[in-house]
Design a protein with these regions (language model features):
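Residue-level marker for the onset of beta-strands and adjacent loop->beta junctions
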Residues: 100, 179-180, 252
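Phosphate-binding site of ATP-dependent enzymes
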Residues: 107, 132-221
């Protein structure tokens, strides 16, 4: 399975190599070509209308210096503290640049290891997982070397030096997988909430407005859950934190 993943990445890098060159010559031209191949309509940067068009405009023209800090799972903690939201941060057990230095013998029974610059660079120890020290070190060292392709215009990734963190394992009271709430904010105001379920099995996404009315046809390539998702009791609090954290940005997704 790992060999297949590695080969897919190699093939992807080869296919996208010309686009990496094009991005250096003309970022606008590069994103226009990739956008058309993916979305099947022309990218309008002069007067963007759709959400996807506006994301490309932000990548090209909105160089907010906070973006790199907020894209890294460790450095974002400082930003959260400065926004006076430090109480919502998960407990940090350890951080460092060398996975060999992780204090394995002193870790709790349950924990999560993350490399800070990728969305899938996670190792979850739920108390029963069979994970060897050598396996953790090997995976983390590989992930630390991962680079983001420049052709996507995501300049904010890779600015901060990636590191390894160990965080507290968070679990739900009913032993179900945690629901992941992502709040889409525009000019510092929450407008939409995405709820991710079954992330590690059959990933599903449901979308709601801030009154918890379901938003149909808002998918991002994943199916809806088909289940009733109750309005969180702390929704107002969740939206207020999202409002405070997104204030410095014209658009932000607060997870």
């Amino acid at each position: 399975e790992q060999v297949r993943v590695d080969m897919n990445n190699i093939t992807k890098n080869i296919i996208l190599f010309p686009f990496n060159i094009l991005y250096k010559i003309s970022p606008e031209a590069d994103l226009k070509v990739l956008f058309y191949l993916k979305q099947h309509y022309k990218l309008n940067l002069k007067n963007p209308k759709t959400y996807n068009e506006k994301l490309q405009w932000i990548k090209l023209y909105n160089k907010n210096p906070l973006m790199p800090k907020c894209c890294d799972k460790y450095t974002v903690r400082e930003f959260v503290e400065k926004q006076e939201c430090g109480e919502i941060l998960n407990d940090l057990i350890w951080e460092g640049f060398k996975p060999e230095d992780i204090p394995f013998d002193n870790l709790p029974k349950k924990y999560v290891i993350k490399v800070t610059h990728g969305s899938t660079f996670n190792i979850i120890q739920n108390g029963t997982a069979k994970i060897s020290r050598d396996e953790v070190i090997e995976k983390c060292n590989k992930w630390l070397k991962a680079k983001f392709l420049p052709c996507y215009g995501e300049w904010f990734y890779g600015v901060e030096r990636p590191r390894v963190i160990v965080e507290k394992f968070i679990e739900s009271a009913d032993d179900e997988q945690l629901r992941d709430y992502k709040v889409f904010c525009f000019n510092g105001e929450p407008k939409m909430v995405r709820v991710d379920t079954d992330r590690f099995t059959k990933h599903k996404m449901d979308f709601f407005d801030c009154n918890w009315e379901r938003i149909p046809n808002a998918g991002m390539g994943y199916p809806v859950s088909g289940r009733k998702i109750e309005k969180p009791e702390c929704l107002a609090e969740l939206l207020e934190y999202a409002r405070r954290l997104s204030k410095p940005f014209i658009h932000a997704r607060v997870d």
